[in-house]
Amino acid sequence: MVIQIIPAFSSVTRSSNARLQEHHLEQVAILIGIIKQHVRNFVPQIFDLVNELWDIASLQLPLVTLVEALGKALDAEFRPFLPSILPRLLKVFEGELTDKRTATQIKVFQAFLTFGSNIEEYMHLVIPVIVKSYERPDGSILLRKTAITTIEGLSQRVNFSDHASRIIHPLVRVLSYQNNELRMAVMDTLCALVHQLGSDFAIFVPTINKVSLTYMA
């Protein structure tokens, strides 16, 4: 049955208009969530579809949702596909920050968490876009908070030892922003980093204390 459904969905999606394409992509993502690892034989075909449709801006959100579903279904088996899809996901963070792009970026952050430890070797590429997102003043509170909590979530999946400084200093700068929701997200994330880094976190404590006393007293 699956052998018939996946090719059929791919064919119909290619030949439909953009509105129907979005619906079909959502259905494929749901199907992947049902059949889970049994989708493995169709992954190359699905990625062909993703690559073919990626440049259609209105489809990027459902395409990221589809990629996230694949990452969740395949778990460790998803690792070989990351080099081909990650550049596309990172490119979502370029250009003007529209409402649609913001929603897609948030979905990419959720996908990063789904990829889990598979993404660890690409942290040097992933961390800059996360940091940029939680620091950017034109970003929505939801986008910035999601970026911050993505660091918290990833801290349970990957080793941040080599990236602590480039993560923590920007987080501390966010504490100066007059928004309690962001500040609480930062504090929760810093606590998660303390848990992972242990004594290596001590070097950052004076700076955190100074900023906390200045802006959160």
What are these regions (language model features)?
Residues 3-14, 18, 33, 44-55, ...:
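HEAT/HEAT-like alpha-solenoid repeats
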Residues 1-7, 28, 39-48, 63, ...:
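Core helices of alpha-solenoid repeat scaffolds
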Residues 19, 38, 55, 59, ...:
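Alpha-helical structural elements of signaling/regulatory helical domains
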Residues 21, 60, 101-105, 140, ...:
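Residue-level detector of extended alpha-helical repeat arrays and alpha-solenoid scaffolds
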Residues 9-13, 24-35, 53-54, 63-75, ...:
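Hydrophobic residues within the alpha-helices of tandem HEAT/HEAT-like
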